[in-house]
Amino acid sequence: MWREGLATGNGVTGVSLYGGAKREILQLGRHDLWYDGLEEEVPDVHEALGRQRKKMEEGSFREASWEIVNALKEKGYDSRLESHIPVANLVVEQTPIKGFRSFRRSLDMEQALASQQWLDGGVLMRREVFVSRAVDMAVYRLSAEKEGMNRDLLEYTFQLSVFRNEGERPTEAIQAVWDAAQTEVVCEGEHTGYLLFNSRREKAAGAGSRQYDNKDVSATDFGAVAKLSVEEGRLEKLENGIKVKAAKEILVTIGLYVDEERASAWQRLRDSLGSQTKTFGQLLAESAKLHKALYHSAELWLGQDAVQAAGREEGQKVNREEGQKANRTEGHKESRKDTQEEWGRTNEDLVLEAFSDRQSVELIEKLWHYGRYLFICGSSPAANPFPLYGLWGGRYRLQWCHNMANENLQMIYWHSLCGNLIEYNQAVFRYMNDRIPAFKENARKLFGIDGIYMTAGTTPGVSSPTQVVPVIINWVGAAGWLAQHYYQYFLYTRDMGYARNVMIPYMDGVAGFYEEFVRFTTDGEGRERILFYPSVSPENTPVNFMPPEGKRIAHPMPTTINSTMDLSILKEFFKNMLTVSQIVGEDFFPRERIEKWNRILKAIPEFRSNGEGAVKEWQEDMFEDRYDHRHLSHIYPVFPGHEVYPEKDPGKIHAYEKAVSLRKIDAQTGWSMAHMAAIYARFRNGGKAMECLDNMARSSLLNNFFTLHNDWRGMNISLNMDPAPVQLDAIMGYVNAVQEMILYAAPGYIALLPALEERLSIGEVRNFRYSDGLVSMKWNQGRKQFECRITPLRPHKVQIVLPDFVEQGKWQETDAVSIAALREKVWEVEFLEGESEMVVFYGWNAGNDTVEY
């Protein structure tokens, strides 16, 4: 099945390899092939906001919840999100010799190389595929190896055709894609042939349609061209494909196109593929070099793998320092006692172990690498944002394949900061800024307000509201939440060109909306207090507004006043805007606007707790907390925000810990457990954080490491839902949670190894990022050994919190660094010059500068 495929890609083009020895499929996809959307002009219903607020003030919340939605429906508004679809399938069928044995699939993440191999009649059959980063094309090699074999036994057929998913009933739009499909076969002698495929699809259309990147509306063709090059065999033209016989090796190169007229695309790709003369190995080497730079931009080793990494490094030193050989070798032998775990097992073994008990150290490390691998293969700074299925979704109507900004899009990108893949956020910023005109129209038409209102769900061709239900339409927090990503990118890059041309145009629009949207009242003591309504805590409903038990209604009444999340977003956003105003100069924004921002901040009250001691999800008493839910929106001040953390706010943390602990386990999803793990890491509770990741691996992980929304087996950790859709935000959230356990980074503050669990007790990381520098660490918690290297990227001042197991710290003296101890295990470090380096180490003699495992 496509859900079990081996994924590879270059961020623009993706390939999923699945099938078997008889019939193998390369599912070919691109970031920009979306279809079957509808974007209508948004009708002006802004007067509904006044009616809605009046009903809310009167306590008629259920009726008020539908006010704007009903106004849209009464005017016949019916926009529809697009679906992300594959471009084509390359289907390869091979005639068996005696039947397969020893079938094996593998994925080399370091080279982005997917492969399958098996034995048939003593012949080693091998298939390998990658997508070149040097030249945007898929490269696929088929080979058969056996000394003295009769090659006439080898026979393959190749077909390049429209994507079809067995069992999926065609809608009118799907049938139109199938009916428009065209194929052509060209053979140039016995050793070179071409397969050409084209179809057409309906783009998002409608009276108010905003097309993709100003491309010609009529340019709806998409397709692929594949070149087959045969070594020592011969090919034969078939009606809809090519037959290859007796080949030692077959090299297939494939180029894809979207929104390009068929004839010109076919000619362009035939010319470019035809001029390609490099071998598979040469093409792989040049692509892998580019891929490795991204894959190794940050690195992690755990347990035995950290030992082996240190051993390799030590081995290099040993060659230079023969006199120390015996001691170091013996040290590594002894250290094996700390890491008694067999490594190198199959995914199936690792996943079964996680299902039966808990994750191994090997699985934790592999999942961290795999999430990053999918991220760099599934998007790029110049492409669309990473979608929930990456580039590997295998249906025409994938469930929830759009860009969803009430959790999922944010989770996909959280890891990119610490993980040193910061530039990938540019895909989100370009995507959102291109849609600012649409978001401003949304704000005017729905609310009668200037500025930006971004509906939570969008696709490349549809920026207007689509999911016309109260839980989506009435939530105005999406744009403010994404503003956090804009602001953090600036903190990490200090790029003033970006600030003026990208960040400020977006954040200024968000500020303009909130300035008009907020209302004020006074509390019992005469202090001004904010009223933010309608306000939604994403997808949750207060328990006192839930229907009677046994009656199932999706999102029955989400529309409230002053949800904790909305107020958290508002507080964070305007604090950041005040900082931005100082950076660009206070005269950049009118003084009256800055005064309004300060007024809003002053009017946001301290967040209150309920009778159980948990921070309230809605700050108004008429809304009661509901724990049977997956979203953790009201924990925003702890994560993904930085407002509350243990060292700064020890008195506040308990209320947030209590709120998380009350969430019911059978209401969770793959992504919510990753989110919860990151929260527990912020609480400095490594045990609970890892328990969440264990639960995620137990309930939402396929054998190819794709993650799902929920368990598909009717178990009791996640919610039950059929189908259980692929959602790759969970694996990205997993990466982030592991990083949060190893490094906490807030502006001007970092905590080293803040939330270790026993399976993270031995490890090494390199080039983890905080806003102004790079952190590399080695540690062995059991031996109380620790080493940290901090490399600044610019002069700055930062507080550094040492790990709990480090009783004292030492550092190398340098004129470029000023260090002061603030309190136990907390230092304030000022880097006076760029490119200096500070080294902290503990637990060995000064002459021994390495952690011994």
Predicted regions and their residues:
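Aromatic-residue-lined binding/catalytic grooves and analogous aromatic/hydrophobic interfacial grooves
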Residues: 1-315, 328, 332, 336-470, ...
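C-terminal capping/lid segments that line or modulate ligand- or cofactor-binding pockets
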Residues: 5-27, 32, 86, 401-424, ...
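Generic recognition of well-ordered alpha-helical segments
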Residues: 51, 253, 431, 485, ...
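The feature captures the catalytic groove of carbohydrate-active enzymes
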Residues: 260-262, 387-402, 450-500, 515-595
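Active-site helix/loop module of the DD-peptidase/beta-lactamase fold
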Residues: 504-510
